[in-house]
Regions:
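Flexible cytoplasmic inter-helical loops of multi-pass small-molecule transporters
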Residues: 89-103
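Selective transmembrane alpha-helices of multi-pass membrane proteins
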Residues: 62-93, 148-154, 158, 166-195
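Primarily residues marking transmembrane-helix entry/exit sites
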Residues: 2-3, 101-105, 118, 137-144, ...
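Alpha-helical transmembrane segments and their lipid-water interface positions
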Residues: 20, 46-58, 80-83, 119, ...
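Hydrophobic/aromatic residues within the transmembrane alpha-helices of Major Facilitator Superfamily
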Residues: 11, 15, 49, 85, ...
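Juxtamembrane transmembrane-helix termini in multi-pass membrane transport proteins
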Residues: 2-70, 124-143
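Residue-level signature of transmembrane alpha-helical cores of multipass secondary-active transporters
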Residues: 6-10, 43, 108-112, 144-151, ...
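Hydrophobic alpha-helical transmembrane segments in multi-pass integral membrane proteins
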Residues: 51-55, 113-126, 183-195
Length: 195
């Protein structure tokens, strides 16, 4: 397994802006960390369910259509390159604040089922880095737990450091995006070179 590429992909994807992280940051800025923790726990729970579903979906595809592994690797690498380009050219979006909304556990959990970033994160990480090397039930469960934990940690970090990240991203947004994009680009290219 390309362990460095795996870790880079996992951490870059989990810690860059996405629906979970932005909602956690805004909620923590507005309601405080303690109230936002319910949302974060919901995100972690939903994340775990999605990672398990992605694991067994990928395993089913590999066992049903063994030749799909190479195609899944190519697709995953192209998706990672797409993400890198999207990160480089992303612009700050207007943040709509609704003073009456406090995102809870159920909101955080259900968000994962419609969050394309999490679903593609799971499919990409598992099909590229895990299934080709470890496909026992124990491995799939442990990697799903790891991926869910890192996703949960990313969301918690965005809520803990919400105001600091907001200032940082406002001031250094393009540099931050460039570094994250280059790390994703490195991961995608190293995967393709291993095949």
């Amino acid at each position: 397994m390309a362990f460095v590429s795996f870790l880079l992909y996992v951490f870059v994807t989990a810690f860059t802006p996405g629906p979970n992280n932005i909602m956690a940051m805004l909620s923590a800025n507005k309601y405080g960390f303690k109230r936002t923790m319910k949302f974060c726990l919901g995100v972690g729970t939903g994340f775990l369910v999605i990672m398990l579903l992605c694991s067994y979906f990928n395993l089913l595809l590999k066992n049903t259509i063994p030749k799909i592994e190479f195609s899944m690797t190519i697709f995953s690498s192209i998706y990672m390159l797409y993400l890198a380009i999207k990160i480089i050219f992303s612009k700050e979006k207007n943040k709509e604040k609704d003073d009456k909304k406090n995102y809870g556990f159920l909101t955080g959990m259900l968000l994962q089922f419609i969050n394309p970033k999490v679903i593609l994160y799971g499919i990409t990480a598992i099909s590229t880095f895990i299934i080709p090397f470890n496909n026992s039930n124990f491995s799939l469960i442990m990697y799903s737990l790891f991926l869910a934990f890192v996703g949960f940690a990313g969301t918690v970090c965005w809520s803990v450091f919400g105001s600091m990240f907001q200032i940082f991203l406002t001031r250094y947004r393009s540099k931050f995006n460039l570094v994250m994009a280059l790390l994703l680009f490195y991961s995608a290219v190293s995967i393709l070179l291993e095949k």
